[in-house]
Amino acid sequence: PRPRPGPPTAAAQTLLCPPPLLGGGFGGKEDASVQHHAALLAYLLQKPVKVKLTRAESIAVHPKRHPMDMTFTLGCDNEGNILGVKARVIADTGAYASLGGPVLERACTHAAGPYHYENFEITGEAWYTNNPPAGAFRGFGVTQTCFAIETLLNRMAVKIGISPWEIRYKNAIRPGETLPNGQIVDESTGLVETLLAVREALEDARYAGIACAMKNAGVGVGLPDTGRVKLVVKESKLHILCAASCIGQGVGTVLVQIVAQETGLDRANIVLEAPNTFTSPDSGTTSGSRHTTVTGEAAHRACLLFNDFRKGRPLAELEGQEFYGEYLAKTDKLGADKPNPVSHVAYGYATHVCILGEDGRIQEMIAAHDVGRAINPKAAEGQIEGGVTMSCGYALTEQYPLEHCVPTARLGTVGLFRAAQVPPI
């Protein structure tokens, strides 16, 4: 029999891993599920190994959204101006932590919504339980606390006699104001504009609901968040090297767009190389809506170096030259001892209106988003439509029942929202 190899030595092991192009990210591919099993078996057996989960195993072990128990108290004056919010968020992270800590941080930094407050107190806890693991899937913890604060705003509007739109417009965060996490928002903040964009449709509808939301870009809260891109001239073409995994976000397309625009090169002369751990610089995880902002800026900086060196010369004269760009999205830790910490480098804002028909079914969804500068408008629209579709399933059809901590649902009964059910958006 072939002798079994011993454990890997302490010396660094160099591994070649060319990740394929995949879809279906949204936080569902952040956790190690079968990768480490396959790698260990392949090392011990010295043979190719494939590990494949059954559908039931996948439903049981892949992280879902965190179940959360949330207690919110909201106060306002007689005109509907919010005076303060107090919230306690308790998350069930399951039998393994996965990203329970970071998810709880996002849930808390977004818990009060995109509104201006004079006073706030927000605490969060994540607990190990015997339930299936929960992770960053679909919203990174933000959807849960968004539901809580938006529901409470509707109740408050009824109590003081103003419309759900008006209470949001009164309290919407505006440039120069401070979010509950202490961060001052800049002049690009566009929540008010999204509210104005949906007002007419909301008022014209007989049955309709409204909600606002905010979402961070980048990992934030003081964690390392660096984008890296290397440009290499090979065979009279400019090659883009970046280890960012393409799992449905369109990061490859965005990088090509940025490089084409910044260098003025025809796209036929730009090559996006597949991620490769031998040659591509590490650009961090594909998570937290970070790559367009963070890795895109790294590409922009590499282009500036390329342009400065090129000085109008043809690519053939630059053969073999390399240009490296790096960008650190620097943020402050939660609880940082400073007056106005920066929790995230950027935020997006949105207002949605759900219009119902006489039968109580969704007739139309209207989504107004402040996306900053849309590098790829079509892709941005697709992400918004995907988010709306997922939220419809989250609100209306999906369920994940457990019996003695074991899931009982099958793929056909978990209630995934079907394409035929998606309303006009």
Annotated model-derived regions:
Residues 1-18:
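A conserved hydrophobic secondary-structure block that centers on an alpha-helix together
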Residues 17, 128-136, 177-178:
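Gly-rich Lys/Arg/Thr-decorated short loops/hinges at beta-loop-alpha junctions or inter-strand turns
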Residues 29-115, 151, 158-160, 164-262, ...:
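Cofactor-centric catalytic regions
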Residues 116-134, 273-276, 424-425:
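A glycine-rich, basic-preceded beta-loop-alpha segment at the flavin cofactor/substrate interface
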Residues 117, 133-145, 288:
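A short glycine-threonine-serine/GTX helix/turn-capping micro-motif
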Residues 130-138, 150-152, 292:
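Flexible glycine/proline-enriched surface loops and loop-helix/loop-strand junctions
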